[in-house]
């Protein structure tokens, strides 16, 4: 079975690529729409500049950013962006399905807790076990 072509709110990826930020903002959910309406921060503009250079092939270093509040735009699709999670840069490969989400959603800041075995005295039954 053939893979279904990606569409965002009825528009293909090519149509989304040709839209301006204002036209794209009308398709996004309210929180992202308001964020784009206020304008991009200087950090977001710098990241967008790097992304546009990388698409042209003029920026060959990995794109690293602390800008977790950047909205994934259609022009980012296909790139790998390293997003900081507070400790390290996590590689995030941008797919069409990510359009409209924030970069920070794909780089979790907290690890899942992996508890070890309980120690002596941790439970009622182990209180009276002799400690060698």
Swiss-Prot record:
<dbReference type="GO" id="GO:0003735">
    <property type="term" value="F:structural constituent of ribosome"/>
</dbReference>
<dbReference type="GO" id="GO:0000028">
    <property type="term" value="P:ribosomal small subunit assembly"/>
</dbReference>
<keyword id="KW-0694">RNA-binding</keyword>
<comment type="similarity">
    <text>Belongs to the universal ribosomal protein uS19 family.</text>
</comment>
<dbReference type="Pfam" id="PF00203">
    <property type="entry name" value="Ribosomal_S19"/>
</dbReference>
<dbReference type="GO" id="GO:0006412">
    <property type="term" value="P:translation"/>
</dbReference>
<keyword id="KW-0699">rRNA-binding</keyword>
<dbReference type="InterPro" id="IPR002222">
    <property type="entry name" value="Ribosomal_uS19"/>
</dbReference>
<keyword id="KW-0689">Ribosomal protein</keyword>
<dbReference type="GO" id="GO:0022627">
    <property type="term" value="C:cytosolic small ribosomal subunit"/>
</dbReference>
<dbReference type="GO" id="GO:0019843">
    <property type="term" value="F:rRNA binding"/>
</dbReference>
<dbReference type="InterPro" id="IPR023575">
    <property type="entry name" value="Ribosomal_uS19_SF"/>
</dbReference>
<keyword id="KW-0687">Ribonucleoprotein</keyword>
<dbReference type="InterPro" id="IPR005713">
    <property type="entry name" value="Ribosomal_uS19_euk/arc"/>
</dbReference>
<comment type="function">
    <text>Protein S19 forms a complex with S13 that binds strongly to the 16S ribosomal RNA.</text>
</comment>
<dbReference type="InterPro" id="IPR020934">
    <property type="entry name" value="Ribosomal_uS19_CS"/>
</dbReference>
<protein>
    <recommendedName>
        <fullName>Small ribosomal subunit protein uS19</fullName>
    </recommendedName>
</protein>
